[in-house]
Amino acid sequence: TNQTRDYMMNRYGEHGFDIDLYEGYETFPKKYWPLKNDLHSDQWSAIRYMISGYDENISRPSHLYKNAISYSRNAYGKPSLMLNELRYVLGDSLFYSSIQHLYKKWKLKHIDEDKIIDAIEEHVGEELDWFFDPWLHTTRHLDYEISSFKKVKNNNAWDIELVIKNKGLRFMPLLVETEYEDGSIDRQWWDRHLWRFEDTLKYSSKKKPKAITLDPDVQLMDLDYRNNSTKMDRRFIFDWPGLNYKPRHAVVYRWMPTFYYNYKTSDFSPGLKINKSYGHYENTNFHFYPSLNPKKIYWHMNGWRQAVHYFPRTKFYFWGFNKPGVEEYGVEIEKKWNRVYGRTSTHTFSGGLYFQPKYDSLRAINLGYNPNGRLAVGYLDWNSSIGAVDLNLNAASTMGDYSTWNFHRLTALSTFKSKKIYGVRTFQRVIAGKIWSENQIPGQEHYNIEGNSANDLLRKNYLVDQFYGSFDLFN
């Protein structure tokens, strides 16, 4: 796996494949898409597995892995990235010559872990247990960060002090790149890495430093590169539909212009949608669109965050919007669970709350809302699937004095998607539920075609309306 990736990237570039062999890459819009980095893609795939809570040791016998996906990750993906890190430590020349030495010594014979390590150490001339043991016999993670950076003018030179902190449990030497104000760069190795969770690197330069980066070539399996540089790279690209672009060393900003028009309320509303994302850890959408009549700025923001070292497969969601008709703010915690990693039913547990402090009666009434009050709802939710059937159970309740209305609701939702027969696929949805209340339920919390409440519909930018204009079909 490592050899194939190295060859393909060396021959065809960082994307790692021959564009001429793939249909569509010379046509719009893929012609203008940024190409992915093949190494980065493999690293992200391994990181998703490593932070899932289901990671297993590479050295485990194949028949003891919990399932085929774990076997695949530990037989191919992780070992290939381990060898990539070994090349980073030894350098290209010594790494490739050590692999050649291994082949010549044991060619056409069955070998084990000890013979591989002994042959490489024999050729390199140093012990590498500190490198191989954590990779092969543990699931320790690597995550270095620059915790502080100081630069002080000292006569005709600059004194630089860099504090490096290890947030993981695996240790590696680091290539440290210093970028200067004149655009030039300088690189040096920090090798005081063994069993150090924090260290200070001090050096001087005649040039004024601008930024510092750890592992600038992104060769290590460092879980989070946002803390590897004093100046994180940013990429601004048009938000092409279907684009999947996740560089390891850069935060990606996608942008797209939007246009809304509603002759009754907001008139013509040109706007801009911006998305900020970084790998498996963060995603934020911000959308604003000023209305010409009335002159008002409407907006919508939502996103999620995921911790690097804690709470595996747990996302923290947030959202807020001020749209024609209603204003809302909400938060949610979501936890996913599988019996093993992948290929089994995923159980998604979540809990959250949302608050609607005010309404615009002109638009809210048209949506079926009751604008005479405010609404605060807390909820718990479970979702899973059995084959082609999705199941959902939701329990919701208003939050005391924060809500004008008082009710409790329990809802079961089932959806089914059939296979295509003669090019036709059918979708079915069943909603069953009950609402308990001593007074009238506001229209925004009634059952409708979207599910639990009209809020499910409102949170979709392209459906801020009745169900195709039909009130009877909507409710």
Please state what every model-predicted region is:
Residues 1-163, 171, 181-184, 212:
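Hydrophobic alpha-helical and helix-loop surface patches within well-folded domains
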Residues 92, 127, 250-252, 281-283, ...:
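Strand-connecting loop/turn motifs
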Residues 172, 182, 200-204, 215-318, ...:
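Outer-membrane beta-barrel initiation region
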Residues 315-320, 330-334, 346-352, 359-475:
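C-terminal outer-membrane beta-barrel translocator/porin domains of Gram-negative envelope proteins
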